[in-house]
């Protein structure tokens, strides 16, 4: 029985109209659905016009990392090094980039294969910038002021250009610092490695940056030491928590207490800068009267007037002091630990130092230091094993329209790019037996290359020694840092015997994403040589 007949039987007076099927509404809904889907797909694809989503992601599971490492707090700060290693072998070794989340910077880093080193080597800041990366992710503007051309000019051109004279000053300051911190103990005496590294880098760093007057002002020295020591601590406070759009505001509040300690540094520094400006405006200053320090070099720079106010210069010099003191100390403490762990190389390095100093009756000069190839090899090997202060190098922010990869994928503006330094330095195809500390590895490689002649097809190892970055935007203070390390390690070897305080080799660094922070609890033992 049809529905119409059933209805008329139950309700005889009800008239049921004949049903005519109209397919137009159904077709309209279907068409609108297709259009909406097309629009959605188009919008979705428009959000990735550069094909960035095609780059694989290496994940860092927090709970699993805490379990693997056996450290509970890794739930909040998972390690970075093991996962970069995973991406390096899975993707970079197959000539592919990958991306990985940097908790300390709250952004993805696009980690590029080694062959991109040549592409970024000579890139100008208008295309990819290290300074922009430092200002954005280290928030240098919060405690002091952003890295600008004045900082780069003073650090790269003037400090490096005056290294011959700086070297003499540096050696004298190091000798005085060692006399204060270690003295002349006849018996083995235990001293904290970080304390030795900090004080021996602080002495020459203060003298070169702030001049003799302020370097001998105990109140000023204490203020600078405390402020610089806290820069890294405050820099990573709350950085591992996703604060969303409130991030910059909250970090500004976090740095408030840190900024309160800045006047203790800026006030006396401002006074010195103002006085020098006043003297120069009243009379001609001869070359012999010119002060030899970064204050003077900053005053002499051809930069705009707003960058040369006493306040502006003072703030930028504090940024430079971070590099000459705290950063160098963080690397040096690892080298002291390596030195104490490998007594078998001490006599060979000592003999070379004595020989080089004897050839130059002027003592520790830039020329004599440059001939200390075994000491330099030790420093390079220590940097290779510890990767310096960070596990990535070549860090830049893309400042141009985009960074084109070979497969036509383009990393858009503001992308964070980097090279996997630590993994390249631990690659057995680059350095055989990478887990072994060989203090004369680089010395032997250079001797082999020298004997092979200019037609050798050997791999350029300089492209694999990346602790100071690479190319035109590498660390501007690297030459100062290397000479400071030579001065300190050389003086220690000549004057002291050194060994580990504990029989078991201590840890060298701590993986704190993206930093490789030095272990500050390591104790060493020193004894003056007969």
From Swiss-Prot:
Q: Looking at the record's lineage, which domain of life comes first? A: Eukaryota
Q: EC?
A: 1.-.-.-
Give a GO molecular function annotation for the protein: monooxygenase activity
Query: What's a single GO BP term from this record?
Result: terpenoid biosynthetic process
Q: Which reaction does it catalyse?
A: preaspterpenacid acid I + reduced [NADPH--hemoprotein reductase] + O2 = preaspterpenacid acid II + oxidized [NADPH--hemoprotein reductase] + H2O + H(+)
Q: Cite the annotated pathway.
A: Secondary metabolite biosynthesis; terpenoid biosynthesis
**What Pfam families does the record point to?**
p450
Summarize what gene deletion causes: Abolishes the production of the ophiobolin family sesterterpenoid.
Q: Identify the InterPro entries for this entry.
A: Cyt_P450, Cyt_P450_E_grp-IV, Cyt_P450_sf
The membrane topology term of the UniProt record is:
Single-pass membrane protein
Membrane-spanning intervals of the chain: 24-44
Key word Magnesium present: no
Which residues does the record give as heme binding sites? 475
> Cellular location of this protein?
Membrane
Q: Which UniProt keywords apply?
A: Glycoprotein, Heme, Iron, Membrane, Metal-binding, Monooxygenase, Oxidoreductase, Transmembrane, Transmembrane helix
Q: Which cofactor does it need?
A: heme
An example of a Gene Ontology cellular component annotation for this protein is:
membrane
CDD domains, A to Z: CYP503A1-like (cd11041)
**Where are the annotated glycans?**
5, 230
Q: Tell me the protein family, please.
A: Belongs to the cytochrome P450 family.
Function in brief: Cytochrome P450 monooxygenase; part of the gene cluster that mediates the biosynthesis of aspterpenacids. Performs the C22-oxidative modification of the terpene synthase sttA product preaspterpenacid I to produce preaspterpenacid II. It has still to be determined how preaspterpenacid II is further modified to produce aspterpenacids.
- What's the protein name? Cytochrome P450 monooxygenase sttB
């Amino acid at each position: 029985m049809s529905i119409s007949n059933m209805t008329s039987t139950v309700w005889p007076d009800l008239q049921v109209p004949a049903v005519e099927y109209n397919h137009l509404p159904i077709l309209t809904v279907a068409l609108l659905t297709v259009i909406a889907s097309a629009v959605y797909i188009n919008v979705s694809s428009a959000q990735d016009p550069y094909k960035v989503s095609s780059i694989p992601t290496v994940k860092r599971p927090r709970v699993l990392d805490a379990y693997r490492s056996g450290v509970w707090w890794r739930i909040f700060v998972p390690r970075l090094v093991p996962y970069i290693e995973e991406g390096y072998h899975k993707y970079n070794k197959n000539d592919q980039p990958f991306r990985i989340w940097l908790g300390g910077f709250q952004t993805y880093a696009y980690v590029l294969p080694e062959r991109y080193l040549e592409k970024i080597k000579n890139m100008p800041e208008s295309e990819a910038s290290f300074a922009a990366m430092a200002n954005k992710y280290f928030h240098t503007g919060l405690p002091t002021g952003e890295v600008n051309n004045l900082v780069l000019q003073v650090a790269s051109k003037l400090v490096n250009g005056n290294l011959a004279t700086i070297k003499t000053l540096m050696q004298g300051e190091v000798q005085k610092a060692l006399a204060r911190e270690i003295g002349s103990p006849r018996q083995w005496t235990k001293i904290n490695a970080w304390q030795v590294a900090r004080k021996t880098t602080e002495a020459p760093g203060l003298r070169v940056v702030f001049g003799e007057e302020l370097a001998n002002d105990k109140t000023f020295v204490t203020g600078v030491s405390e402020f610089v020591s806290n820069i890294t601590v405050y820099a990573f406070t709350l950085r591992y928590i996703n604060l969303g759009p409130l991030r910059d505001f909250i970090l500004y509040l976090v740095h408030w207490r840190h900024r309160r300690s800045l006047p203790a540094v800026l006030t006396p520094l401002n006074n010195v800068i103002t006085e020098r400006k006043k003297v120069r405006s009243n009379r001609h200053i001869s070359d012999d009267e010119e002060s030899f320090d970064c204050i003077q070099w900053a005053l002499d720079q051809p930069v705009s007037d707003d960058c040369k106010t006493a306040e502006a210069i003072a703030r930028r010099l504090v940024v430079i002091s971070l590099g000459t003191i705290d950063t160098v100390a963080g690397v040096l403490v690892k080298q002291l630990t390596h030195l104490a762990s490998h007594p078998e190389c001490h006599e060979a390095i000592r003999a070379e130092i004595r020989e080089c100093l004897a050839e130059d009756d002027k003592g520790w000069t830039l020329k004599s230091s440059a001939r200390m190839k075994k000491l330099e090899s030790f420093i390079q090997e220590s940097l290779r094993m510890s990767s310096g202060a960070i596990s990535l190098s070549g860090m830049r922010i893309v400042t141009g329209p985009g960074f084109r990869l070979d497969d036509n994928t383009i990393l858009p503006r503001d992308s964070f790019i980097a090279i996997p330094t630590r993994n390249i330095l631990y690659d057995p195809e680059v350095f055989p037996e990478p887990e072994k500390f060989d203090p004369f590895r680089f010395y032997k490689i250079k001797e082999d290359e020298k004997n092979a002649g200019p037609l050798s097809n050997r791999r350029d190892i300089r492209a694999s020694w990346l602790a100071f970055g690479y190319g035109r935007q590498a660390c501007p203070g690297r030459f100062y840092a290397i000479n400071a390390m030579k001065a300190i390690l050389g003086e220690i070897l000549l004057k002291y015997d050194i060994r580990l305080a504990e029989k078991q080799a201590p840890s060298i660094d701590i993986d704190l994403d993206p930093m490789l922070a030095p272990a500050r609890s390591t104790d060493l033992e020193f004894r003056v040589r007969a």
